[in-house]
């Protein structure tokens, strides 16, 4: 089961890794990311850079999947805890355990019988304890169902709705695993009923309250960050685009999720780096360039500061 549903990393170039820049030691803070000024034309007489492997476009559609929550963390807890988004709607149904989940820059606690719906492209990450159980429903890239346009966090306290939601998810999974003719189509019909369940129960989300100004700004920041984290922009650039000061943006992020604006940015970039290192054979220099770093050495220092090991050591560890 493929758990990562951004650009299909397995389709990246599978050329042998090219020679990479020497890796720097130490834990310096992330630096050396490209800015608009650093992306200009090369100086006259500069050597022409050798072309690096290209990253292809993602497919337009992906299948519906139901995945146990425990399996999402296979390969490392960073796969669920780091900030990221996926290009398809997602429902997390927690049936046991508790922890914290951050969606759109806002952190809340979750417990048993909590349903969290995350629209495509929405940044999220969550902590899961050893006793956390449930399922993740991936609606598929290209999903045309009428689904909520904003995230929902539903605390399902009544037994009836709990059983209804669990039954819908079981029906989807049963069809997908049956191998019978029309199973995919039947699963999508059950998925449509799941969308209706979200619509009916979503009316009570957050007690009908609209998000305050801080939460709206945090959501706008994470939405902007998700679209531009590869650009090399810093917090000051995002703050300018949002019409606020970097200090105010950082204060708001600390208020809504307990993390600074810079921490959210770096977490998102390094998550993508981890995925590219673990799921592709792209050279480290190509990954650094794709994520907006000015050199492989700067990328190595930033990665080691967050991940505790160099990019090549992380890749070797699998």
PLM segments and residue spans:
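A short, Lys/Arg-enriched amphipathic alpha-helix from helix-turn-helix/homeodomain DNA-binding modules
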Residues: 209-242, 247, 264-282
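Basic, amphipathic alpha-helical hairpins
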Residues: 174-181, 197-205, 221-234, 252-253, ...
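Terminal helix-turn-helix DNA-binding modules in bacterial transcription factors
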Residues: 255-295, 316-318
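N-terminal regulatory/effector-sensing and dimerization cores
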Residues: 61-152, 184
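Amphipathic alpha-helical segments enriched in hydrophobic/aromatic residues interleaved with Lys/Arg
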Residues: 150-202, 222-223
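…primarily DNA-binding HTH/wHTH and HhH modules…
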Residues: 1, 26-33, 37-38, 42, ...
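Membrane-cytosol interface segments
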Residues: 2-58
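Append "Primarily bacterial transcriptional regulators
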Residues: 113, 237-244, 249, 253, ...
């Amino acid at each position: 089961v493929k758990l990562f549903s951004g650009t299909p990393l397995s389709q990246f170039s599978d050329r042998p890794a090219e020679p990479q820049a020497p890796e720097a030691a130490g834990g310096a803070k992330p630096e050396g990311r490209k800015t608009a000024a650093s992306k200009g034309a090369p100086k006259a007489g500069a050597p022409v850079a050798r072309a690096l492997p290209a990253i292809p476009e993602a497919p337009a559609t992906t299948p519906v999947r139901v995945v146990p929550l425990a399996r999402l963390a296979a390969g490392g807890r960073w796969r669920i805890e780091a900030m990221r988004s996926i290009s398809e709607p997602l429902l997390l149904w927690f049936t046991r355990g508790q922890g914290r989940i951050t969606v759109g820059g806002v952190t809340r606690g979750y417990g048993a019988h909590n349903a969290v719906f995350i629209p495509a492209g929405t940044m999220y990450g969550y902590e899961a304890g050893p006793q956390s159980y449930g399922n993740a429903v991936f609606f598929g890239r290209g999903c045309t169902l009428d689904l909520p346009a904003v995230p929902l966090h539903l605390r399902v306290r009544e037994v009836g709705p709990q059983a209804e939601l669990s039954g819908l998810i079981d029906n989807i999974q049963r069809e997908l695993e049956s191998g019978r003719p029309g199973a995919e189509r039947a699963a999508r019909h059950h998925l449509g009923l799941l969308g209706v369940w979200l619509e009916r129960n979503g009316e009570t989300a957050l007690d009908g309250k609209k998000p305050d100004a801080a939460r709206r700004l945090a959501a706008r920041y994470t939405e902007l960050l998700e679209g531009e984290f590869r650009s090399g922009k810093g917090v000051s650039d995002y703050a300018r685009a949002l019409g606020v000061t970097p200090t105010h943006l950082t204060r708001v992020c600390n208020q809504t999720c307990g993390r600074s604006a810079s921490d959210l940015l770096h977490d998102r970039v390094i998550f993508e780096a981890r995925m590219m290192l673990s799921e592709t054979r792209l050279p480290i220099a190509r990954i650094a360039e794709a994520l907006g770093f000015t050199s492989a050495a700067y990328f190595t220092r930033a990665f080691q500061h967050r991940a505790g090991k160099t990019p090549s050591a992380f890749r070797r560890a699998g």
